[in-house]
Amino acid sequence: MNALNIAEYTHTLGLQAKTASAQMARAPAAIKNKALLALARLLRQNVDALQGDNARDLERARAAGLAEPMVDRLKLTPKVLETCAQGCEQLAAMPDIIGEIQGMKQQPSGIRVGQMRVPIGVFGMIYESRPNVTIEAASLSIKSGNACILRGGSEAIDSNKALARLVAQALAEAGLPEHGVQLVQTTDRAAVGQLIAMPQYVDVIIPRGGKGLIERISAEAKVPVIKHLDGNCHTYVDDPCDIAMAVQVADNAKTQKYSPCNASEGLLVARGVAAQFLPQIGAVYAAKGVEMRGCPEALAILRAVPGVQLAEATEADWSEEYLAPIISVKVVAGVDEAIAHINRYGSHHTDAILTRDHMHAQQFLRDVDSASVMVNASTRFADGFEYGLGAEIGISTDKFHARGPVGIEGLTSLKWVVLGEGEVRT
């Protein structure tokens, strides 16, 4: 497509989405749930075909020299597809919040005032790699009564097209409009520029991908953006703590999977437990090939660990999102220094404390300025599915509208409802 055709194409998608959004907003819960259950069924019925489409994307990605963490994000394994199907079913089982009126109160004038939860309208989703985002976005759009326009990365085009066909089939089975969920069918980057500049059609943009993509969208968008830039998450091992539990959680937070934005990239250890904890986690990381970039105090303890991969941390390491088997390690005086470090260098995404001290836990929960804060749990739990939201559209580190994993509620807004019996203002 040339520039003119791209503009015409995206405006057509926008108009179709805007038109469909009215019907999506009115759809009864039973109809939306029917579409979600149909989508779950279709995902399970088409695992082999979907993996065939996905294999072509993987082959192209490797041939193009795409970094292994990015290739990993492209994979549509049976486990990934089953998680998507379960997410659809979980959403279908959840109450429909659209149309709920809350906080209704009678005023001295006689009128009653409350707020009704309504869909945002149309959201645009721009994402890289992970084709499962197509299903997560589509299912949340359906449940929340929105229409959406999805623009996946060129590296996942075959997978995204195959998944979008299943979404269209599920919408049709439920009697919902075919344009309720639309995938941008071109990989031309000009389509992104058009999509983020159509406030007449699109109410919010949600970018999900690398820092470069999100910075570009944030700078150029003419509509509101729900986003997070980095996933520089921390695990802080406090004094006192259960050392065995801390080793297990710190291991999971880093090594369960390296590519997600909720993997821990920084490990902070209280000085009082460092000599006991660091050799144990060092041995675990050494066995898994994780490089530890530490402060001088941490390195002095870790050098005695057989096979450990060590490097001296630089200032840049404290802010780095590695998405790889690398973790920064710093010994701190205690909870106050840990909180200060996290708030200075972290990305306000997810941070955890491992402790047996209730007051330290409460201080951490209160003072760490992140979208998710955890006590004695892995940062890998920062996920809409794990939080019981069903699928998630993304994770927001902003403080307005939505913060943390964005599920159904994050794709809605509140409008004021006033009920009267002929009252007039005096």
From Swiss-Prot:
Cystine pairings recorded for this chain: none
Keywords (A to Z) from UniProt: Amino-acid biosynthesis, Cytoplasm, NADP, Oxidoreductase, Proline biosynthesis
GO BP of this protein: L-proline biosynthetic process
Domain of life: Bacteria
EC number of the protein: 1.2.1.41
An annotated GO cellular component: cytoplasm
Location relative to the cell: Cytoplasm
Family matches, as Pfam families: Aldedh
GO molecular function ontology, one term from the record: glutamate-5-semialdehyde dehydrogenase activity
Gene3D superfamilies: Aldehyde Dehydrogenase, Chain A, domain 1, Aldehyde Dehydrogenase, Chain A, domain 2
Pathway, per record: Amino-acid biosynthesis; L-proline biosynthesis; L-glutamate 5-semialdehyde from L-glutamate: step 2/2
Keyword Oxidoreductase included in the entry's annotation: yes
Catalyzed reactions: L-glutamate 5-semialdehyde + phosphate + NADP(+) = L-glutamyl 5-phosphate + NADPH + H(+)
The UniProt record lists the keyword Oxidoreductase: yes
HAMAP family (alphabetical): ProA
Record-stated family: Belongs to the gamma-glutamyl phosphate reductase family.
Role played: Catalyzes the NADPH-dependent reduction of L-glutamate 5-phosphate into L-glutamate 5-semialdehyde and phosphate. The product spontaneously undergoes cyclization to form 1-pyrroline-5-carboxylate.
Protein name: Gamma-glutamyl phosphate reductase
Taxonomic source organism: Acidovorax sp. (strain JS42)
Gene name in the database record: proA
